Amino acid sequence: MPPHTLLLRPKLLFTTLAALALGACSPPQAKDPQADASAAIANQVILPTYTRWVEADRQLAISALAFCAATADLATARADFLHAQKAWAALQPLLIGPLAEGNRAWSVQFWPDKKNLVGRQVEALISTGQAIDAQSLSTASVVVQGLSAYEYILFDSKPELADATRKASYCPLLVAIGERQQHLAEDILAGWTGTDGVLAQMSKFPNQRYADSHEAIAEVLRVQVTALDTLKKKLGTPMGRQTKGMPQPYQAEAWRSQSSLNSLQASMLAAQSVWLGVDDKGLRSLLPADQKALAEQIDAAYVAALRALDANDRSLTALLADPAGKPLLDDIYARLDSVHRLHQNELAKALNIQLGFNANDGD
């Protein structure tokens, strides 16, 4: 062994021991429960929901092609649409990142539609006889790009009565919407999972989006509060709460497919998943021990709202047309309102979050 190697060894040993000693004296890394919750919600709740949405839209694109090629029937096409719509509804409390920017959500679903723009613009586009594909559709009005237009074609254009010529006139748009939704969903997911995407930004701080974990948790809660408020509007508007009690069934989110309440339930389940988290790593985990009563109150509010929705097997349209349906809808609305107010007031205060204005203010 060379002599100089022996001479260096004591110095190396001293350096190593010094480093270990300094490490032992350094304070342990402080725990950050908000960072843990943010990362858990992003990875275990939000990302899987976005992934399911992408998968549903891929199937929607396949379904449109199959229906138009007459290798799948109308019932199958409608079932695939309802699956995609349910996957979209589950995203409502999770609109963080690319989908919440640039009005992209309008390209997925156009609601509210107070003037039947969906039906009018679909028919106007079809009547032009122009070639339609996903590329041209991406620059068209958002009214005809998304699920609302797809729903119109499958449920309101009388496809079951259409002859081959009429079906052929709608099919290019149906196929284009399916492809457009698939591409949009895949782009949004890429914005989540890419380098420095939202997933990374909600998992490690600071970054370009969040100065710290508290900002991330604050956005999660703000999105929750806005979504819950929107759910109240989606139920309250057709109930007539903004029109002096006069029901407005055609203002329901999915009146054509009679699936408005199913979408509402999917959104509520997603909101509850953010609250509870996976392995108890949701917003609930951030409440201190002295807020146990509030945690249990929010738990109970979610259970009551979901139970009220689950106990009903009638469509929103049917309930609005039946005087006996009013107390049932009033009960569901009151329970949604309870969940919303608990988040907006008590939970925000307990987590020291200033909510400010939400996206629905001024509606």
Role assignments for model-derived ranges:
Residues L22-A24:
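C-terminal motif of bacterial Sec signal peptides marking the signal peptidase cleavage site
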Residues K31-D363:
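Mature extracytoplasmic or organellar-lumen-exposed domains after removal of signal/transit peptides
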Residues P2-F14:
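Bacterial N-terminal signal peptides that target proteins for export
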Residues S26-Q29:
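Bacterial signal peptide processing site
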